[in-house]
UniProtKB/Swiss-Prot annotation:
Protein location: Nucleus, PML body; Cytoplasm; Nucleus
Motif Nuclear localization signal, residue numbers: 32-39, 223-230
The protein's assembly and partners: Interacts with XBP1 isoform 2. Found in a complex with PCAF and MYOD1. Interacts with FOXO1; the interaction deacetylates FOXO1, resulting in its nuclear retention and promotion of its transcriptional activity Component of the eNoSC complex, composed of SIRT1, SUV39H1 and RRP8. Interacts with HES1, HEY2 and PML. Interacts with RPS19BP1/AROS. Interacts with CCAR2 (via N-terminus); the interaction disrupts the interaction between SIRT1 and p53/TP53. Interacts with SETD7; the interaction induces the dissociation of SIRT1 from p53/TP53 and increases p53/TP53 activity.
Compositional bias segments (type: Acidic residues): 120-135, 687-707
Cofactor details (free text): Binds 1 zinc ion per subunit.
Known outcome of mutating residue 238 to R: Impairs in vitro methylation by SETD7
Gene that specifies this protein: SIRT1
Free-text function comment from the UniProt entry: NAD-dependent protein deacetylase that links transcriptional regulation directly to intracellular energetics and participates in the coordination of several separated cellular functions such as cell cycle, response to DNA damage, metabolism, apoptosis and autophagy. Can modulate chromatin function through deacetylation of histones and can promote alterations in the methylation of histones and DNA, leading to transcriptional repression. Deacetylates a broad range of transcription factors and coregulators, thereby regulating target gene expression positively and negatively. (Microbial infection) In case of HIV-1 infection, interacts with and deacetylates the viral Tat protein. The viral Tat protein inhibits SIRT1 deacetylation activity toward RELA/NF-kappa-B p65, thereby potentiates its transcriptional activity and SIRT1 is proposed to contribute to T-cell hyperactivation during infection.
Pfam families documented for this protein: SIR2
Lineage: Eukaryota, Metazoa, Chordata, Craniata, Vertebrata
Binding site for NAD(+): 261-280, 345-348, 440-442, 465-467, 482
Source species: Homo sapiens
Stretches assigned to the Deacetylase sirtuin-type domain: 236-496
Name of this chain's protein: NAD-dependent protein deacetylase sirtuin-1
Effect annotated for changing residue 684 to A: No effect on phosphorylation (in vitro and in vivo)
Amino acid sequence: MADEAALALQPGGSPSAAGADREAASSPAGEPLRKRPRRDGPGLERSPGEPGGAAPEREVPAAARGCPGAAAAALWREAEAEAAAAGGEQEAQATAAAGEGDNGPGLQGPSREPPLADNLYDEDDDDEGEEEEEAAAAAIGYRDNLLFGDEIITNGFHSCESDEEDRASHASSSDWTPRPRIGPYTFVQQHLMIGTDPRTILKDLLPETIPPPELDDMTLWQIVINILSEPPKRKKRKDINTIEDAVKLLQECKKIIVLTGAGVSVSCGIPDFRSRDGIYARLAVDFPDLPDPQAMFDIEYFRKDPRPFFKFAKEIYPGQFQPSLCHKFIALSDKEGKLLRNYTQNIDTLEQVAGIQRIIQCHGSFATASCLICKYKVDCEAVRGDIFNQVVPRCPRCPADEPLAIMKPEIVFFGENLPEQFHRAMKYDKDEVDLLIVIGSSLKVRPVALIPSSIPHEVPQILINREPLPHLHFDVELLGDCDVIINELCHRLGGEYAKLCCNPVKLSEITEKPPRTQKELAYLSELPPTPLHVSEDSSSPERTSPPDSSVIVTLLDQAAKSNDDLDVSESKGCMEEKPQEVQTSRNVESIAEQMENPDLKNVGSSTGEKNERTSVAGTVRKCWPNRVAKEQISRRLDGNQYLFLPPNRYIFHGAEVYSDSEDDVLSSSSCGSNSDSGTCQSPSLEEPMEDESEIEEFYNGLEDEPDVPERAGGAGFGTDGDDQEAINEAISVKQEVTDMNYPSNKS
């Protein structure tokens, strides 16, 4: 492009002449030059009187042969004659079009890349989009080189030069996610100029939410920006529901995107983060000054004290673990040419060990390390000795007295951008994919969490995970231990996949929930009745009254003690407490303490007193089954079973889907974890489909405008439901580290 610009700026030249010079020079003498088709409007691809269709080949005038300058001049005069013959109106159209993207015959200039969607989340502008993608794909060698033109080292990782380009990248998820008609930054800018109160906008976006008064206006506007940046939610396809449908898709699809998280590495023995003896707990003991466990992944904290990170690095450094069945399954799909791309959030490099070639490491990996100062880059083996000896690795090229000359593994820390390669890949893969499979990820952190909503909504989506993801709508949900599910799929796929199976037994399907285990029945028989006396007219608050509060506290304590063995999940010898259960218990105990408080009985009139006590009692009743008797449905299955819950949910061993004792309604392990009150409402098996986003109403009637890429920042405030997840994910990247890119047994 630099050469083209130089030629175009030569005195007496023109962009078209420059292109013609090059084309004529590269063609053997005597061969005709082809006229490039023009896309600038009707009638410009042929001369008057010529039939429609492809442009005919042209002969260079004999006098011009062998003289590139003369050939260019001849073609230029011929083009001018055509434009004049086409009429004044067409000439004006040609002039306007040439100014935008066509520099005349012989050279088509670089096309300007418009926003991804000019209309509100409109993905139908195929004509212009296809031409742009073809040009961009040709420029980066798309599909010809899986690393998009980057150099490949023998171990399959980037060269230093390509990584430096990635660090300087300004690419973002706005390059591949559906864009609104008017961007969120423009929308906010307009309202800032007219003095709109951001709380008014937030009230429309989140009617049931009241932002804390201490939040300043700029923080609230940042919240608005992030909410408006959310792409519309995908709706489930009604024609894809069963595991048989999933197997058929795996057999037929040729461009599969597999998005993997920590769940695929659990069985590999990689230490978890959040258990009692996990990495976080041990770091808290060794580094009491660490403000919070996630700080070890904060780039600013790393510059101040890199020791916590390198202690963690030793725990999961490459070379200590072997790939899981999930990794091998993806590698075989890659080998058979079915894998379009594996986007992994993990940093353990097990994808490379398994032999996966089409891999995008969204959050980096331990494969290489580079100096914070000079960017000198080395292989992971160069710093292995220092890391295992718990010595902070230093850059060999920087001065010894430079405190920041640290060799940092190329993991994406909080405060750092994702590699440009991720955004480049997603920009084109989103239009190529014919099947999306999410394995072992809760998709809580952006921009990876935006992938399911950003690909065409008709593309089938399959979830393989321990727990359901209520904020997304998958066509088939296979819930349980990822290796168990992949093992069953391999049995059904047969051939080379069947050879991967760790368990030779094919599972049998049941459609009715198995009865409770003897252990659970014995436990339930010892429980006292629900600690609320509800009359026949339970809808009347006047007739609902709690018993003595001390009874509730006593019963809760007994239940907590008896239920300890039911509130943990097993994962290959590692026990992890359910944080949402703990949170629920705290809420219940807090309510009980309020009931014990004698001041509560002395507040207000008798009517106000009764209503307040009724409200507390109602909260306790909602919390009671969640705290007292929730059990994993998967524990009722025998070793060779899985449960089918129509229309599209399957429960395998290890699934974190629970059953409440009172009404036996299924609920997710994450139920109630985002609720301020701690209450939990069990979702139905077939979750209602969401209507189109209400956010679209903000854009109706507004003109198309480009917008700057989105950036995460700001702070959030409490609310319930999907809106809370949208805010939490969009506002701060500092969230669930283990759900982001660091392996744990809770994915």
